[in-house]
Amino acid sequence: MEAFSLLNYWKNSGGAVTFLPHSSESSSSSLCRYSAGESIGTTTIVTSVTETEDEEADENDDEGPFFDLEFALPAEEEDTDGGVGREGDSDCTDGGCEFKFTLSSCSGGEDRVDPDSLDDVFFKETIVEEVEPPTSSEQQTCSVKAPAAQLSASILKTATKLRVFMLGMKKSKLIQAKSEANFGSEDLDKQTHPPPPLSLSPESQQKSTVTVNLKVEEVPIISLFSRENSSKNSSSSSSSSSSSSSSLKKQNGNESVVSDEKRFVMMQKYLKKVKPLYIRVSRRYGEKLRHSGQLTAPSSARSTAEKADSPVATKTNNKPGNNINIPAGLKVVRKHLGKSRSSSSTATTPSSTTATVTTQSESRRRDDSLLQQQDSIQSAILHCKRSFNSSRDKDPSVLPRSVSEPSSYEK
């Protein structure tokens, strides 16, 4: 057994891979060449071809080639070994890039390929036939003698990052189910009806190459409902958080303002309802206090008002034919005013200047009270002196007693 490696990497749009022998006599080695177009990512495919030429295989007419495919991917490496009864995983993703490579088998001079040997490799996609012009006579004879089997293939790149479209899931599932059904029917047709031997015509040369369409796509892992750019996501998230916080603050401020306005309106309504009742109660209470007859003078305002009303009351009482009930408080005030010396002056003042008169009368009253005290003291002193002088003149024996006890006389 001889292992041959197929080196070269495909890029985005596709290319052709062809097994070409180095020499027809020395060995049956084949080299896989690949031509690639525009690319998105980078992926390396290493394919080894093993041809069996044992005696037992010749006796059993098992002349088909066996392919061992090994894929080295940038994200992760995965080996795919060709064996009987093993089927490689294959899916179709929406919006991928296509790769095309052509496999032409060189089995060393066999006229046909056993369809049973094709069970070693399974593919699922349509065939795209492509012809490469032979570069030498050896290659031409090899391609003529060894027609390739027509295989339907689609290989999914086993990368760790895949893009998922929610809207295209149903469509992709339906397409996959249809492709699997078509593949099963083609398999049965191949097993029951082997292909007829091909003639040496240009059509057979065209069918000697098989082109496989591959779709590979490299995308970053992102969530289904987020944007592809992380900076945009961060800026949008920060802006959304700031806008949400500002909106919450505005809502709280508006709610506080509305609550304050509601409170103010409620207080105004309450005061409007309570104010007339308060005024009525205060008026009634003032009238009761005025007509109760037990008024006292706790504050200067009430005392001044009573003093202002007292001259008018005295005038009305002095007039003949006026029988008016005067409260007891006013009577007391009138008595006090009658005793003072300034009662006459306050009685003659007009009622229009009651405020000024009351202040003047209070000051005069204080002055008069001081004068009265001084007069009484002076009169007492004079009385003592007179009595002392008169007693000394009348009775001289009192002198030593008065001299011995001067304090009694001073008192």
Swiss-Prot record:
Residue ranges, compositional bias (Polar residues): 248-257, 293-303, 313-325
Domain of life: Eukaryota
Subcellular location: Cell membrane
Keyword Manganese: no
Keyword Membrane set for record: yes
Keywords tagged on the record: Cell membrane, Membrane
GO cellular component: plasma membrane
InterPro entries: MAKR2/5
Low complexity bias locations: 231-247, 340-361
Region described as Disordered: spans on this chain: 184-210, 227-259, 287-411
Coiled coil: none
Name of the protein this chain belongs to: Probable membrane-associated kinase regulator 2
